[in-house]
Amino acid sequence: MSDPEPLPDHVARNRAYWDEINAPLYAAPGRRSWARDDITWGIFGVPETDLRALPDVEGKDVIELGCGTAYVSAWLARGGARVTGVDSSEEPLKTARALQDKHDLHVPLIHGNAEAVPLPDASFDLAVSEYGASIWADPYRWIPEAARLLRPGGELVFLVNGTLWVLTVPDTDAEGPAAERLLRPYFGMHRFEWPDEPGVEFHLGYGDWIRLLRANGFEVLDLIEIQAPPEAKGGRFDLVDPEWARKWPAEQIWRARRT
C-alpha cells in the first residue's frame, strides 16, 4: 500500500533506518517472540500476567501501531482479537509475513505511516504500540491518529523508554548503558537524534504526555513503571544494567481510554 502523501522527514528517515537494521538486529528476536504464546513486555520480558497492562482482547478489534515483525499482533490474535498491524518499514513486514506463514496465523499487515493510517474512523477497540509508533513517530501526530481510529471507550496501551532512562543514557552506545546522573534536561523533551544513529526518536515528559492524551479525548488510566525482575541478567542491546533497572524504571507503559 502506497503512502497517500509525501512522508515527513522523520518518517522517511526512520523507514530507511528500520529497513536497514531489521535483519541483523530484530528478525531473530521476532522469530523467538512468535514462537511463544505468553505476552511479555520490554527488554527484560516481564510477563503480562504480572503487569496487567492489557484489557481482555477476545472478540475485540485491535490495531498495532508500528508492529515491526508483528509478534505482539500474533500474541493478541492468539488471545482471540481481530488484529491489524501497521508499520512504516517494509523489511520488518517481510519477516512478519514469513512468520505468519510458518505459524499459520495471519492478520492484515499495512505498510504505512502510523501518523496517517489509511483506515476509517472508529474502527478499533484497542490500539497498542510496543516501542513502535510510541517512540518512532511524533506523539503530536500519532496520538491524535490513535484517537481517531478508536471507538468511544476504546483503550490505548503503549510502551516507551522510561523518562529517567532517557535523561541518563549516554549519547552513544560506546559510552555504555544508563548512568546514575542526569545527562540532559527534562524540560523541552520531544525529538531526539542520537549521534551514532540515523533515526529519529520521540520522548516526552510526564506532564506533556498527560496533557497530550487529555487534549485528544483520552482519560489516563494507569502509568506502569516496569522494574527489572530479581532474576534479570541483562536486556536487549545492553541499553540498561539490570541493577539500574531494579532501582529506577527503564521502561513505562501508558494506559488510556478514549472518552
Residue ranges and their predicted role:
Residues M1-A35:
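N-terminal, positively charged/glycine-rich alpha-helical extensions of SAM-dependent methyltransferases
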Residues V200-L223:
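Short alpha-helix
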Residues E115-L126:
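A short acidic, Gly/Pro-enriched loop at the edge of an enzyme's catalytic core
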Residues R31-K60:
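Conserved alpha-helix/loop element of class I SAM-dependent methyltransferases that forms part
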Residues Y140-E155:
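A short glycine-rich, Lys/Arg-flanked "PGG" loop and its adjoining helix->strand segment in the class I
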Residues E155-H190:
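Conserved class I S-adenosyl-L-methionine
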Residues L126-Y140:
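A short SAM/SAH-binding and catalytic strip from SAM-dependent methyltransferases
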Residues D61-A116:
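Class I SAM-dependent methyltransferase SAM/SAH-binding core
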